[in-house]
């Protein structure tokens, strides 16, 4: 059995490059979601966010573990910006598949806020998943094909949330 997660945290190239390497992540693709333009493209994606769709094996990596890594590799305290990229396309967002994912997302955001690991309050949006418009082939696995390409996503050493007593998410 597999599950799906959809996350937005700035330019999708860097997000995909780091997340696809996580054990238990089976497949990723980048695209656009959360906006108003049908059949979104790189040149015409309206109010959509650049996002990554993740297919994962929940017996190998939990949804909360994906979210914790997501919060480690991008700045969730800056609205509509990651690195040099500015605008609503680069916002931080979690698009949940069901009420359980929504609950886990909201709890994880509260834990990130309480941890003090980011200097500002988390501004990550939590919204229901809608249509996901796949980006063109030139954007898929971009940093795998062009390893010297642009990214503003990096794992932050030592950045981990305190372990929860009741794991299982």
UniProtKB/Swiss-Prot annotation:
GO terms for molecular function: L-methionine:thioredoxin-disulfide S-oxidoreductase activity; peptide-methionine (S)-S-oxide reductase activity. Coiled coil: none annotated. It catalyses: L-methionyl-[protein] + [thioredoxin]-disulfide + H2O = L-methionyl-(S)-S-oxide-[protein] + [thioredoxin]-dithiol; [thioredoxin]-disulfide + L-methionine + H2O = L-methionine (S)-S-oxide + [thioredoxin]-dithiol. It comes from the Bacteria. The keyword Heme does not apply. Keywords: Oxidoreductase. Its EC number is 1.8.4.11. One of its GO terms (biological process) is protein modification process. Gene3D superfamilies: Peptide methionine sulphoxide reductase MsrA. The active site is at residue 11. PANTHER family: PEPTIDE METHIONINE SULFOXIDE REDUCTASE (PTHR43774), PEPTIDE METHIONINE SULFOXIDE REDUCTASE MSRA 2 (PTHR43774:SF1). Belongs to the MsrA Met sulfoxide reductase family. Has an important function as a repair enzyme for proteins that have been inactivated by oxidation. Catalyzes the reversible oxidation-reduction of methionine sulfoxide in proteins to methionine. This is Peptide methionine sulfoxide reductase MsrA. It comes from Leifsonia xyli subsp. xyli (strain CTCB07).
